[in-house]
């Protein structure tokens, strides 16, 4: 292979990596739209989404590990179990929060996770650079505008969204130190935990044919396909680029419900969200340490 051919091949891989990660972000961004179309109660939403996610992720793990499913789950270790528990909290809080506030509010709060992760890292001895404190301060101002502005979002929705973001930030910190933890089995186990928690509150009689399709789209499409595309793309491009491209989810999510359902975020929400996104982009661009590729709730 000539140098020119190798260069072209690397450029092609880089482009494919960007496309895969962008497709992951698009898949994740559909969560708010699908959830808004559901008529079932929140317990049924949680259990149904988790059940389909488990099926999809088990199939993915079986294919990726060439049938060694049990081996893959054993390999995640104690840290993988902790990650699964935190992801279960984050994933469950995500769906619950969508029932209390706008898609834009939930996703803008979710965008805080990388900045919060930098702060949580201090508890495991990671130094916090000045740029991180700047990003955190700006992000807090953005959240303050969203919460305290004239849009008056639900306090319950904002609080649950913050729980989602903090728990996901903890996942980022752990996976940054334990890059050997496989995210697919951990994500699958997290959905098993969500299913076990939500099952007593679920009512199968609430699920019609339309809701069944929507729950399948949430579980298999939004979670499963998103993780598959991320896994394919993250191998081909730098982690910092992955982190930036996945921010498409935060932009597209509110856009889908705005176009399809006329759920228009208020001016304060959009302004505050833009400030939060700006802080996260600043943190990602200026940080010399690449973040691990981690799928969101």
Report the location of each language-model feature.
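Transmembrane alpha-helices of multi-pass small-molecule transport proteins
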Residues: 40-89, 116-120, 167-171, 187-203
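Helix-helix packing/entry segments at the starts of transmembrane helices
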Residues: 106-112, 174-193, 223-259
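C-terminal transmembrane-helix exit sites in multi-pass transporters
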Residues: 61, 96, 113-134, 251-271
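Glycine-/small-residue-enriched transmembrane alpha-helix faces in small-molecule transporters
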Residues: 1-48, 85, 89-93, 141, ...
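Loop-to-transmembrane-helix transition segments
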Residues: 16-24, 68-95, 155-164, 199, ...
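Hydrophobic/small/kink-forming positions within alpha-helical transmembrane segments
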Residues: 29, 33, 51, 58, ...
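Hydrophobic transmembrane alpha-helices of multi-pass small-molecule transport proteins
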Residues: 57, 87, 131-148, 160, ...
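C-terminal-most transmembrane helix of multi-pass membrane proteins
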Residues: 2-7, 50, 247-297
């Amino acid at each position: 292979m000539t140098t020119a051919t190798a260069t072209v091949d690397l450029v092609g891989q880089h482009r494919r990596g960007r496309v895969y990660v962008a497709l992951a972000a698009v898949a994740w961004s559909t969560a708010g739209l699908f959830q808004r179309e559901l008529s079932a109660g929140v317990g049924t939403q949680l259990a149904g989404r988790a059940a389909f996610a488990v099926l999809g992720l088990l199939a993915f793990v079986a294919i990726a590990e060439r049938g060694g499913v049990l081996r893959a789950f054993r390999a995640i270790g104690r840290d993988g179990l902790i990650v699964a528990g935190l992801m279960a909290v984050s994933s469950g809080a995500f769906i619950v929060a969508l029932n209390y506030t706008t898609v834009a509010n939930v996703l803008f709060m979710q965008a805080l996770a990388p900045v919060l992760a930098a702060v949580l890292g201090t508890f495991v001895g990671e130094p916090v650079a000045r740029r991180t404190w700047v990003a955190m301060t700006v992000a807090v101002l953005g959240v303050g505008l969203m919460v305290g502005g004239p849009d008056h979002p639900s306090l319950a929705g904002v609080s649950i969204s913050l729980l989602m973001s903090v728990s996901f930030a903890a996942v980022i910190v752990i996976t940054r130190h334990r890059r050997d933890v496989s995210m697919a089995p951990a994500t699958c186990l997290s959905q098993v935990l969500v299913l076990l928690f939500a099952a007593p509150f679920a009512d199968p009689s609430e699920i019609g044919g339309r809701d069944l399709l929507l729950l399948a789209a949430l579980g298999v499409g939004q979670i499963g396909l998103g993780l598959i595309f991320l896994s394919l793309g993250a191998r081909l491009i730098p982690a910092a680029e992955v982190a930036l491209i996945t921010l498409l989810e935060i932009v597209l999510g509110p856009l889908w419900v705005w176009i399809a359902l006329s759920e228009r975020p208020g001016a304060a929400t959009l302004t505050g969200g833009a400030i939060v996104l700006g802080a996260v982009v600043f943190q990602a661009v200026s940080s010399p340490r690449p973040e691990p590729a981690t799928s969101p709730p």
